[in-house]
């Protein structure tokens, strides 16, 4: 993806300004079967890799990041850099039934 490094740099720059967790992200993070912490999401944003790019997303250019949280569990974060903050759209634990290659690629349906 030609703009891959550009959007990732924008994500990290926006996160240094401020991070806004959208209601959907908070609901997903607080599910009892997930319990994803803010610290885990921030670690994914700071050190994770971009695995999907959504330049035409209705919410604005966004991307899917993969990183690792507590006990090295895989965490996916969908986020969109804005002018003065990073919007965290959702965060979840990827399902091994839907992902392969270390949770980097979706299985074809």
What do these predicted regions represent?
Residues 1-109:
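Ribonuclease/tRNase effector modules and their secretory precursors
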């Amino acid at each position: 993806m030609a703009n891959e490094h550009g959007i990732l740099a924008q994500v990290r720059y926006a996160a240094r300004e401020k991070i806004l967790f959208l209601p959907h992200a908070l609901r997903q993070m607080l599910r009892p079967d997930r319990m994803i912490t803010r610290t885990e999401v921030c670690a994914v944003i700071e050190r994770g890799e971009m695995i999907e790019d959504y330049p035409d997303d209705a919410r604005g250019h966004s991307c899917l990041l993969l990183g690792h949280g507590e006990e090295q569990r895989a965490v996916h974060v969908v986020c969109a850099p804005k002018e003065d903050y990073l919007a965290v759209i959702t965060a979840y634990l990827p399902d091994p039934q839907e992902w392969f290659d270390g949770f980097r690629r979706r299985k074809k349906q």
